[in-house]
């Protein structure tokens, strides 16, 4: 079960390792560094090492484990900060006695779970009940916000059977809490189990994504929505607001479990993001957001190979909570750094490069990642449903959206939220470019909006979007000929577009009145602008200049409403405002002939 190092090239080690399996976890060198077999040629294995290889030398041992890189799944996951291979960073700090991560700290020294933690286990089954993989056996209260459901693990060796015994009371995470009698023998179930990170967890059926994931961000929820179980990409250059977007989604997205994966970002930026996440409070309860969050951190100065592990690890943790019936959101920042790690490892093991040096399997890996999202019927008894939503940022060099990572990502996502440096530098946040962005979920979530908010939602949204497109066309004329060349109707279009941008699309992520915005407030803000547009058209037909409409008191107040009205009073106050706006615009046509 062991071999010897033959040569070392950065994060890649070649070893003579008879019997090695693809993607098998191995320990490299005297320090027992984490590694994963990524290529096999006869008895030779190419290993990507998840720790710094400085000081390794040929002839040192390589030890096989016989199992793939796996996530440890069970209570005590929530509230922890892991590295790419699920080692708790706080435990590593206490072992290292240094702010820098020491090498060779294995799961024996820093286990991903606190196996000695005691929880009050409440059984959901009783002796004699028939259970199958995926069924809930019981639950523990992991945090004040989350109940952790213990399921019969859907491992290949676990078969359906009869409950022989089930625990009730206080038990450790590593204690047996149930015995299942199957045709293959008796299975002892603990509160935790392992799952290979590259293998998607099973489900019974994939459902269409019909319920929107409300984020509190107006440009997303209304203009370019994402559904629960959907996928989204947030590409943008440096300074365009990707990290603030991830923070906002972490805090306000209506998912029960949030898993941010900081993959390959700058260390200082990751530290700032971590400090911000640790201070966040759950908006509905006031409890620390960390009680329903697990964070995976792999900065740019950590070994590049671990970036790949961090992405798969975060997705596996998300699937685990999805299998408990929760709505889960995985936020990866950023997939470009993961792709760069793939490129470096692929070139070092001698694989044929493709476009811009990336490996030919880049689209396959991106597809495997995004396809693990979904709203699904869970395996086991009953019709339990869970969802895993994936939103990932992309960092194209120089903001070039035609580079391979961004262009391939476009093939596999349902929502595209490109961040514009032009908008960011003009202090328009979120800097989502509404002319480039798209969402494939508008049709599927329309029923939810019509049923829960208003049947007019889709029609008004489409009108406002068409006004923004028309504004872009008119801006070309204005640049050449000036506003004097425009008709009153076209001037009105520009005025309405300004209201859409300033009064609806722009949003202050740090203002508690402006963020988050409830669905009903979003709709009524949108409707107020729509009323200004429609009633203004009638007034212009009656001979009222667009400049007079723009100077009305209610119209002047329109861009400020988002900052003035809280979510709890928005419905009543905005309804009154729309009536006043309609009345004031109509009063301008009194005594005029069309």
From Swiss-Prot:
Q: Which Pfam families match?
A: ATP-synt_ab (PF00006), ATP-synt_ab_N (PF02874), ATP-synt_ab_Xtn (PF16886), ATP-synt_VA_C (PF22919)
Q: A GO CC term?
A: plasma membrane
Catalytic class of the enzyme: translocase
Per the similarity annotation, which family is this? Belongs to the ATPase alpha/beta chains family.
Q: How does it sit in the membrane?
A: Peripheral membrane protein
Reactions catalysed according to its record:
ATP + H2O + 4 H(+)(in) = ADP + phosphate + 5 H(+)(out)
- Could you say which residues bind ATP here? 236-243
The gene designation is: atpA
**Record function comment:** Component of the A-type ATP synthase that produces ATP from ADP in the presence of a proton gradient across the membrane. The A chain is the catalytic subunit.
Give the protein's recorded name. A-type ATP synthase subunit A
The main location is membrane
Q: Which organism is it from?
A: Pyrobaculum calidifontis (strain DSM 21063 / JCM 11548 / VA1)
Q: Which UniProt keywords apply?
A: ATP synthesis, ATP-binding, Cell membrane, Hydrogen ion transport, Ion transport, Membrane, Nucleotide-binding, Translocase, Transport
Please name the InterPro entries in this protein's record.
ATP-synt_VA_C, ATP-synth_a_Xtn, ATP_synth_asu-like_sf, ATPase_F1/V1/A1_a/bsu_N, ATPase_F1/V1/A1_a/bsu_N_sf, ATPase_F1/V1/A1_a/bsu_nucl-bd, ATPase_F1/V1_b/a_C, P-loop_NTPase
What is an example of a GO molecular function annotated in this UniProt entry?
ATP binding
Subcellular localization is given as:
Cell membrane
